[in-house]
Amino acid sequence: MLNKFVIKLTICIWFGATGLLAQSNLKKASFIPHWSPQAQFAGYYYAYETGIYKKHGIDLTILTGGPNHPASVLMQKGEVDFASLWLTNAIQLHAGGVPVVHLTQVINRSALMLVAKKSSGIEKPEDMNGKKVGIWGGDFEIQPTAFFEKYNLKVRLIPQGGSINLFLSDAIDVTSAMWYNEYHTILNSGLNPDELNTFFFSDYDLNFPEEGLYCLEKTYARDPRLCREFVQASYEGWVGAFEHPDEALEIVLTYMKNAKLPANRPHQRWMLSRMKDLIFLQEITGNFPELTEKDYYFVAEKLRDNESIKFIPTCEKFCPEWKKSTDRKTDK
């Protein structure tokens, strides 16, 4: 009897020690999404809550992003290891002296759009001439500005906050929207898709790849394997979230409630579905979409043209993980 007890005790101690050793071998890292908790970041939350980051050897802390905790500022200060950023934001940071580097693209297709009611008579870009257009600031105004210039439009720009009320009340003729967010809010307000005309910038040769994962150059140089494991774990988190949407939504809603944000399940479900469309387009592949050299330089040149940056960082400097192609460009 005593021998059995000793054997069981030894097994428990061994498994406990093994677990502690595994925990001690985890590398600590921090990550901040570029906005407040919502299904736009479901893959990262899912990977964390289901132990995927730990499986890849990472003891991750996920910080709460949003307007009060800008990911770009924390990255600039070196207060976070990894961040999700829009490509436009990351290029401006790098060109401005903050050595952020691109680890992977997450969304290659722009979800930014303009929306007009059919009752306004706006059916094509030229119909916006002289109209009142709601526009966000910062990175969100780069594509609309290029769009208006492309079609030689003189519009009345109206600063747009986080609400679509100006559009619903006809105080503006056209509103800015993200496909996975505000567009669905418009539909929930009582307007049907067949009552709206949508203008996706990606359909007008102004596609800007959006969300990607980034770190500082020194983080990558110090531990490139950690960076790759973080990317792979994040990818697996997104696949898991899409394969188990109900579980992923529960996780997202919990994060939103903890951040004291209003949580609407149908809206978050729409957002999660659209994220799947944006990340994988047709079907789930074995990895995140790749940022192409063509797309990188296209966006960078637009930023230089509107004087957001003074020079274009080379792909070699900006994308240390970038796969070389046979027709790549040299320094710009």
What is each model feature region?
Residues 295-332:
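Conserved C-terminal helix/tail region of periplasmic/extracytoplasmic solute-binding proteins
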Residues 8-19:
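Bacterial N-terminal signal peptides
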Residues 154-157, 193-197, 258-274, 309-316:
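Short, surface-exposed acidic
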Residues 24-160, 164-180, 207:
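Short, glycine-/small- and polar/acidic-enriched structural segments
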Residues 1-9:
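Bacterial N-terminal signal peptides that target proteins for export
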Residues 222-306:
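Secondary-structure end/capping motifs
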Residues 88-89, 162-261:
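Pocket-lining segment of extracytoplasmic ligand-binding domains
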Residues 61, 69, 199-201, 266-273, ...:
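Short linear loop/turn motifs
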